[in-house]
Swiss-Prot record:
GO terms for molecular function: metal ion binding; metalloexopeptidase activity. Its main location: secreted. Disulfide bonds: none annotated. This is Probable zinc metalloprotease SNOG_06590. Zn(2+) 1 binds at H161, D181, D253. Residues 402-496 form the Fibronectin type-III domain. Glycans are attached at N138, N241, N282, N361, N409, N415, N457. Its cofactor is Zn(2+).
Amino acid sequence: MRSSMFFAVCAAAALQTALSSPIHPRHAHQSFPNTEQWPIATVGKALKQQLPDEELQGILSQVSQDNIEATIRKLASFGTRHTLSSQTDPARGIGAARTWLTEQFQEAADASEGRMTVDWNSFVKYPGDNERIIFPVNITNIVTTLKGSEDPDRLYVTGGHYDSRNSNPIDYQGDAPGAVDVSNSCYTNWVWEDASGVAVSLELARIFAKYQPKTTIVFTAFAGEEQGLLGAENLAQTYKNNSVNVAGMINLDMVGNSKAEDGTSDPYNIRLFCQGTPLTENSTTTTSRLSIGGDNDSPARNLGRHIYEVASNAFTEMTVRLIYRLDRYSRGGDHRPFLEAGYTGVRFVQPNEDYTQQHQNVTVRNGKQYGDLVEWLDFEYNTRAAKVVASTMWSLANAPGEPMNVGINTTTSDNFSQFKWTAPKGLPVEGYEIVYRETLEPHWTSVIEVGDVNWYNLTSATIHKDNVIFGVRSVGKGGYRSPAVLPFPFGCTRNC
């Protein structure tokens, strides 16, 4: 009996040792290299993030926390900014907010020596299939355009929405906090959803007005967001109907608070939501994209990677965290109508959310304050977010356009990767770069400088097209780079 127990214990111990060991006992005497990067980069060099040049550093140094806070507090003072609220009251409602914002954008434009203009993009929305529109209402976007000096026909749009709502999406008569009946309150002054984004748009318009970007930048304040992204939809369709080249839309919606509902603080990160397969992509292109594993390299996600490279640094004191989603669960934002119009759009959002402060009546329940109030804001965080957006917009607006017709030859199966592309229109290109990364990496890790050519033959068998994701990007004056473009296969006859 003792002998049986002894052998059972020994067997169990041996089994446990075998299960816990990552190396089979027969090979325990052997060793093997464990490389962190695979495939081993034998071509090119490690890719480094782009730091701001002296001019951009000067822009970042001008971003004012005081200005951002003052804008938010002023927007809060209008009580409700509901899309259906008064448009004639000089002190309360969306009309008063619109008038004040227009004046502020115009004041910025006055310092631009004629380069910046302020316009209204207005339309009337009637009741019908939208249950949040209960009577005809004029909806007005404030559109502030800073014309580019060399390639004015390429636009980059940024901004947030200045309308607001509370728990009841059709309550448009709520007064400002302080006149609130706790038992029956439906009032809000809505500060970071989305006064925080509008404040950034206005602050950057003030600063950029004194500079001359090479391409056009549009600073917006959208209305009708809370009724179904109506303002952004109208502006996106207006651009589309007029064949305007919107090269990128950067939505700023909820960028003013670093704390979560449980008090967790994350003050140095900002989320960037990036859609995968384009919403308007045709089935043939999508099939090709999926066949090469390119669903993670949509224009939106490569724009996101570009933003990470130019805006995550010690000058912004922030790290951009890409989120591979169109938006948060069950939520939407003003970048979506641009995506639906065939443009590239992404959305900045603070790292954590407190749902007691979103779309809530301003009230106290069980000793806890609800509502979107000024005291919840982290103005230092909001200011750092503004620097991230400033770095993004300036870097995009001074870079060449993305290379066009980017392809990779798949005529035959071999160890070579032959790329071709055509030059973008507009700003001159000084050269091109091929970037690559392991398929599971979120960001580009390596870069090959190929010069001012329109093709390149990569002869390295270790950096095989089956094992990495490639991108091609333009490089312009001062080292400003475009977002990378995924090469699609050409010359293949099946499975592509």
